[in-house]
């Protein structure tokens, strides 16, 4: 069993010297965005050239849930010498598209997403959708994954959050960081080594507080303690590395808080319109995983993956394990409860062999034999949520007009463990008053 540790052991920490408005704004936000007529973003990558980044308006102004005022949103397009192209939105700090070269010099968009802002506003994760939406490409926060019962205790104080996923809070609550408008900090990054941009969100003390009777908050919700400032820097280099660096500062001088950020991109290396990804090979650098109860909250144990459908220590076709009920009854029940794979893997301790760019630890490798594309995930986080799009039910149409269904993509959500605020044996997600954390994940394509 892993002993309790703090953010200090997982990331650099340094000492540095509302609800009603949000719900109303979300309703208005959807109405304003409905006028959006943004063209599809399915154009293939350009001819290989140097590193570049551009910025353009994306859709019509939408309402900022924090202020209630309409704001313009933007799309950033990063390209490298290989012709790889990444499109990033200031709405939700969403990764909209990633075009990667494959066999025969063919490019494909390898993440699921929508073509228009209207679709992101109305279909990603607003509270009008039961149990949230798919969170395509979102920057997830303030707390990624689930918190049991939508409640946790910190320093003797009980905090309550919206129960937007059955009895639990999922991916931050009713709004989450993915439904907010992020703002660019500084100029566009463009050096000989990389291009990129930093997007910022200030999450106030009491974020996700809601009045009694609000969906998911029958008795009202206190929201999260402490104001935090979140800066996420997205970069692309000529090696095909898509870097995501999170910097979170607790702006409060007295209140601690909990933080667990991640990226919720859905990958299909054959292309987002290619159908099931069951033949793609998955490898996860983990000897253990955290099994869950009937509502997908960890039981508190770290179970060996050996001899179970959760064993991806060697490259394994996704379809071999996703519905494998032939090993043991416990594992079978885990798959049935989650309708497939939707679990947290406990990443192995870093070794010289598993150390990659920026000194990060190997989390996972995915590959597609047909296209020849490969994705390697590097991180400093202790876990990764591997989710095989179990709940995509054919009601969403993607960026190229293709209908998305189960097993057509998968996520590698690098993270601290689900429900860590309620499970002291897990690595701690507490960010103390005045502290700053830094954490990085790299998605490397080849």
Positions of the model-derived regions?
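An exposed, glycine/acidic-rich loop-and-rim segment of catalytic or binding clefts
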Residues: 46-84, 89-446
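Secretory targeting and sorting signals
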Residues: 2-41
